[in-house]
């Protein structure tokens, strides 16, 4: 499950599926962050913090401390913070060490820094000590580029050709009768961590990009959320859904 704590990003990547911008002020508040973490932990043992660029949220490090404190009372929780690393300094090494210590040895607290010079226009000094720190992993490849957001304006990139929208698995499973925990656990065990998504304002989206429409809210009951998902319709990825077989369209109610 994704928690998007901001829609701001200054990197300006042309392949961005969210169309994140530097002048954006859409940041998750502490109140919503606490509710989002509680919601996530209720249904899923995996938490992925994202954005935009999550470190652009003015309360980023405070949020990480809140998160470490919350999971310290639990076991076998996996936290991944997805960042481009542009705001990290060597001083953050000590903060990351403290966060991982607070989270406890029974939990995983990982910072994943994705930096591929081909796609990321602002260079990062990868010789900094922070990028050698345990708990900070470097992703130097992007396996798939999605045809969404700002990326639609850049046909020079090679986009993968999906057989269905990113929301298909989650929507089809919940429409097929799975509850939220069963659906997200099945996805996690299949190596799929990016749906559903909690937006910066507390809304729930069934797709991966911040441009996906809102479906429900984190204070809704599970029965309300499932009902809204089952009744949900979206034409945002019509370039994909229009080419699906009839039985697959029926599986997500399109």
Segments from the language model and where they lie:
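Short coil/turn linker and secondary-structure boundary residues
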Residues: 28, 88, 122, 219-220
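Short low-polarity hydrophobic stretches
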Residues: 5, 53, 110, 126, ...
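Short, solvent-exposed loop/turn segments at secondary-structure junctions
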Residues: 10, 54, 86-87, 116-118, ...
């Amino acid at each position: 499950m994704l928690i998007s704590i901001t829609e701001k990003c200054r990197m300006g990547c042309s392949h961005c599926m969210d169309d994140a911008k530097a002048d954006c002020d859409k940041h998750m508040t502490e109140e919503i962050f606490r509710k989002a973490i509680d919601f996530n932990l209720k249904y899923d043992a995996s938490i992925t913090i994202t954005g935009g660029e999550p470190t652009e949220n003015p309360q980023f490090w405070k949020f990480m401390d809140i998160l470490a404190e919350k999971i310290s009372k639990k076991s076998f929780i996996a936290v991944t913070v997805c960042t481009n690393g542009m705001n990290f300094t060597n001083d953050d090494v000590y903060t990351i060490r403290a966060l991982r210590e607070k989270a406890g040895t029974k939990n995983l607290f990982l910072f994943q820094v994705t930096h591929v010079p081909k796609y990321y226009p602002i260079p990062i000094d990868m010789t900094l000590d922070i990028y050698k720190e345990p708990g900070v992993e470097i992703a130097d490849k992007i396996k798939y580029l999605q045809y969404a957001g700002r990326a639609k304006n850049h046909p020079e990139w090679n986009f993968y050709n999906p057989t269905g929208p990113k929301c298909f698995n989650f929507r089809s499973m919940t429409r097929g009768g799975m509850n939220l925990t069963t659906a997200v656990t099945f996805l996690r065990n299949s190596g799929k961590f990016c749906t559903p998504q909690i937006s910066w304002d507390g809304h729930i989206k069934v797709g991966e990009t911040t441009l996906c429409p809102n479906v429900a809210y984190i204070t809704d009951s599970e029965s309300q959320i499932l009902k809204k998902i089952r009744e949900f319709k979206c034409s945002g990825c019509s370039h994909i859904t229009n080419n699906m077989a009839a039985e697959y369209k029926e599986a997500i109610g399109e």
